[in-house]
């Protein structure tokens, strides 16, 4: 992942088109014509070996070395067979960025993409493409693409992987008068990836929103890191194609335990704070909303129409999507009653009647939009003689400055409605073909706000903490099994693994013979269940074709020791017949759990080929189709995210509706989900783990049947909490302190820490007075992305067992891992104990270990203690005249290539 040289793609001052002619079908000719039509303000040169000196007014050169200077950007339109060689020559010439528009279709060049990538790597040039449409940056009058049209400047950045879809979006946007800050299609880009561009747009663009079209995700962690950061600053909408196996293409990817992988993408998008749209129509409607509406404050929608039928369509969709009808204030109700007396008590949706005039539409909007309980107003119009479509639209538009809330419109119909919708487009007011589409578009903004609110919530403190000893025992167990060459755990080994993480299993014995099973049955009161455990039934997510039939490897309701002994003989004989090559491990003997008013659940961890470990939850049991209620989340989980996962499921709703202790039950389930999340983070060799069923009753959660298998070390889409960075230290006054990475649950403690800082300490840290930390502040400071940030807290455990934060240090690292910026702050009453030095040394050690080249920080001139600490730690301190601060710089690692040396000398590149 890298933003290296990306500015040359989007902000070039000089540009060369390689391979262009005046022929109508010339790809390069189309690019040159677009540059001319867009009014590109920089220099353009054309490289073509033919005997031509000028094309579209631009000078043509036959040799690369003849160019007057090294261009910032090269657009390669040559045939595929020479494109890799051209890339390497451009890189050696000093060009930093190359767009490869050429497709390999029809050329049949073997290893085309690999050859392009190797050429880019050999010559230190960044390559976007092949098969990309190109780049449009209307604000800079740049159209380096083969798009058939230019686009207006706007505030939405579109980043996609399909050139043809990009063309369609341009045509649609021009028809609606909608603009873009950037329009970028990457095609099959071998070097510059989607996440690289997202990073660049987030950091360097003034775009207010990002619309993504995805076909595939080559690097899930880079992608999740980039979009998680972007969605904190901008609204990010995403549409994913290839949702079904039939549309996926080759190779087909599978996730054990899931009939369809698309829910994994939905879970990842939600976790990153994005809003997903389901189809191209919805995507276009979302664009309309993004470009023409201010951010909404909430989900309270008021609906005005000249007929109840159309407005009820909007109401149904609103409630189905989780929105709510605004409850109008008493003042607004009185105004409406005086304005239009009616016996109808329904005021939202507001039916102003089939006899309403254009002026009455305007008056209704003015009254309703002034209500403080309304977040947005939707106006639904059906054509009448008294309120013609176009005349009514023009009246609404003429008074738009008097409306106090966001306005959405749906002028229904086609013949008369079409010119009315055109007028709304010209006026920049969102308009939709149907009331349902308008509501859907409104809910995009609402869902974004909800996602952000969820991600900013402070997770409750964990009521448990797995000990280091238990985690190490679990690691040793898994390592021993993997070292033996076995790719799965036995039932007994899985029980021991879960026990290390505080997940209890029902009383279970593991007899090796029928005789031993009969003897052990004496220890269990009541009826028993018996299962045979062998290699073939030790794998998770292996289901029978008929889920309502009990497995042949399980016997239930065995009453006597003799029943158990005979049952064991029968099960072993069946195993030997059906699975003669499957090693026998043991029988699994448990008491039946009937009569405890239990609910059966299914929990587990599976591994997706793109996003890595995924946590699963839903209805469970031996005789149900558990796939119908399988919901999932991307780990690591905290209690808030676990609660969201449970709430999304049918099982969760059943608990809320039928349990007498719903909150306690939900808390217990969420704790278990967090433990599973921690387990898969601690043990990367775990490929899959399934608990089915897990029994929930009023007293306990009990795992009944479990399976677990192993694989290669997992690659997490979101970097897990770095437990290994915890360390105990002793301060000068003898007190014991733990230094550990910060986590989301620290918000309350961090707020308490902040309240004990002096105004001067706060000003030295934030460069201004900051008496309070907002909810958003706490979220940004505690729920960090460990892939690019790190924060260490020094925490002391008090005599009563409570904990408090004594100091915090943190770093923010750029996407290329070149520079990291630090900050450190210590409680005033603890300064002089060496804590600041210890926290800084922890930061320096960590940053060195991850390969960062340089640590920097800005210090107020009057902050003499910090300046002294920097000098002690070896930082070079110099006065920054422009910002009037001290810049502290510490080299951490030596650069290993020319690009890193270049970036250190040229931070903007």
Locate the predicted segments by residue:
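Long, contiguous binding/interaction regions
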Residues: 713-909
């Amino acid at each position: 992942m890298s933003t290296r040289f990306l500015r040359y793609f989007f902000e070039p001052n000089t540009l060369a088109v390689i391979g262009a002619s005046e022929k109508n079908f010339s790809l390069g000719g189309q690019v040159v014509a677009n540059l001319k039509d867009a009014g590109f303000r920089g220099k353009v040169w054309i490289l073509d070996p033919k005997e031509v000196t000028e094309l579209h007014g631009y000078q043509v050169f036959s040799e690369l070395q003849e160019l007057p200077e090294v261009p910032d950007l090269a657009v390669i339109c040559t045939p595929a067979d020479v494109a890799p060689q051209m890339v390497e020559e451009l890189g050696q010439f000093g060009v930093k960025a190359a767009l490869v528009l050429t497709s390999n279709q029809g050329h049949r060049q073997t290893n085309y993409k690999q050859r392009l990538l190797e050429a880019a790597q050999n010559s230190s040039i960044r390559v976007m493409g092949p098969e990309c449409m190109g780049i449009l940056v209307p604000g800079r009058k740049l159209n380096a693409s083969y798009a058939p049209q230019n686009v207006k400047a706007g505030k939405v950045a579109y980043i996609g992987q399909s050139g043809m879809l990009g063309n369609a979006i341009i045509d649609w946007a021009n028809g609606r008068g909608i603009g873009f800050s950037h329009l970028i299609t990457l095609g099959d880009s071998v070097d510059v990836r989607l996440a690289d561009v997202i990073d660049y747009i987030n950091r360097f663009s003034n775009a207010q929103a990002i619309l993504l079209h995805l076909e595939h995700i080559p690097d899930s962690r880079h992608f999740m890191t980039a979009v998680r950061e972007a969605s904190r600053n901008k609204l990010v909408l995403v549409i994913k194609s290839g949702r079904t196996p039939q549309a996926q293409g080759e190779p087909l990817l599978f996730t054990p335990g899931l009939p369809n992988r698309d829910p994994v993408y939905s879970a990842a998008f939600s976790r990153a704070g994005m809003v997903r749209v389901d189809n191209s129509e919805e995507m276009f409607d979302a664009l309309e909303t993004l470009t023409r509406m201010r951010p909404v404050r909430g989900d309270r929608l008021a609906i005005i129409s000249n007929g109840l039928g159309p407005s009820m369509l909007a109401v149904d969709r609103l409630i189905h999507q989780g929105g709510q009808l605004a409850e109008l204030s008493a003042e607004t109700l009185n105004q409406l009653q005086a304005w239009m007396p009616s016996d109808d008590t329904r005021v939202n949706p507001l039916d102003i009647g089939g006899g309403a005039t254009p002026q009455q539409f305007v008056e209704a909007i003015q009254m309703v939009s002034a209500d403080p309980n309304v977040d947005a107003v939707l106006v639904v119009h059906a054509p009448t003689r008294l309120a013609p479509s176009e005349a009514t639209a023009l009246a609404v538009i003429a008074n738009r400055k008097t409306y106090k809330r966001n306005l959405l419109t749906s002028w229904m119909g086609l013949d008369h409605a079409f010119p009315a919708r055109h007028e709304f487009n010209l006026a920049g007011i969102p308009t939709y073909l149907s009331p349902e589409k308008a509501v859907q578009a409104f809910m995009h903004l609402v869902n974004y706000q909800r996602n952000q609110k969820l991600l900013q919530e402070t997770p409750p403190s964990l009521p448990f903490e797995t000990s280091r000893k238990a985690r190490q025992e679990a690691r040793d167990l898994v390592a021993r099994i993997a070292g033996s060459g076995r790719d799965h755990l036995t039932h007994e080994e899985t029980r021991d693994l879960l026990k290390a993480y505080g997940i209890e299993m029902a009383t279970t014995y593991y007899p090796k013979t029928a005789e031993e099973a009969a003897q052990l049955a004496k220890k269990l009161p009541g009826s028993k269940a018996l299962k045979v455990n062998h290699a073939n039934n030790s794998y998770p997510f292996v289901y029978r074709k008929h889920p309502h039939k009990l497995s042949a490897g399980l016997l239930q309701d065995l009453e006597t020791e003799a029943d158990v002994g005979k049952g064991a003989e029968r099960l072993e004989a069946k195993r030997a017949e059906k699975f003669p090559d499957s090693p026998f491990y043991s029988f699994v003997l448990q008491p039946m759990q009937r009569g405890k008013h239990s609910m059966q659940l299914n929990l587990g961890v599976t591994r997706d080929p793109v996003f890595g470990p995924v946590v699963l939850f839903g209805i469970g049991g031996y005789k149900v189709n558990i796939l119908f209620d399988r919901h999932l989340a991307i780990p690591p989980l905290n209690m808030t995210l676990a609660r969201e996962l449970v709430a999304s499921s049918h099982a969760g709703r059943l608990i809320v509706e039928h349990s007498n202790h719903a909150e306690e039950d939900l808390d217990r389930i969420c704790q278990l989900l967090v433990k599973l999340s921690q387990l898969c983070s601690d043990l990367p060799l775990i490929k899959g783990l399934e608990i089915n069923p897990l029994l929930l009753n009023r007293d306990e959660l009990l795992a009944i049947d479990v399976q677990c298998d192993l694989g290669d070390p997992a690659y997490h889409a979101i970097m897990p909490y770095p437990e290994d960075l915890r360390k105990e230290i002793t301060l000068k006054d003898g007190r014991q302190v733990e230094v550990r990475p910060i986590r989301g649950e620290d918000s309350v403690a961090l707020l308490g820490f902040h309240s004990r800082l002096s105004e001067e300490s706060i000003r030295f840290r934030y460069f201004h007075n900051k008496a309070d930390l907002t909810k958003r502040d706490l979220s940004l400071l505690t729920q960090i992305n460990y892939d690019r940030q790190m924060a260490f807290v020094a925490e002391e455990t008090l005599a009563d067992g409570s904990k408090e934060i004594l100091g915090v240090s943190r770093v923010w690292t750029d996407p290329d891992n070149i520079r990291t910026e630090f900050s450190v702050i210590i409680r005033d009453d603890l300064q002089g104990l060496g804590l600041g030095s210890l926290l800084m040394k922890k930061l320096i050690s960590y940053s060195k270990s991850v390969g960062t080249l340089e640590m920097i920080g800005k210090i107020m001139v009057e902050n003499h203690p910090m300046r002294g600490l920097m000098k002690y730690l070896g930082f070079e301190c110099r006065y920054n005249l422009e910002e009037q601060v001290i810049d502290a710089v510490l080299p951490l690692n030596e650069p290993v290539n020319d690009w890193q040396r270049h970036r250190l000398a040229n931070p903007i590149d």
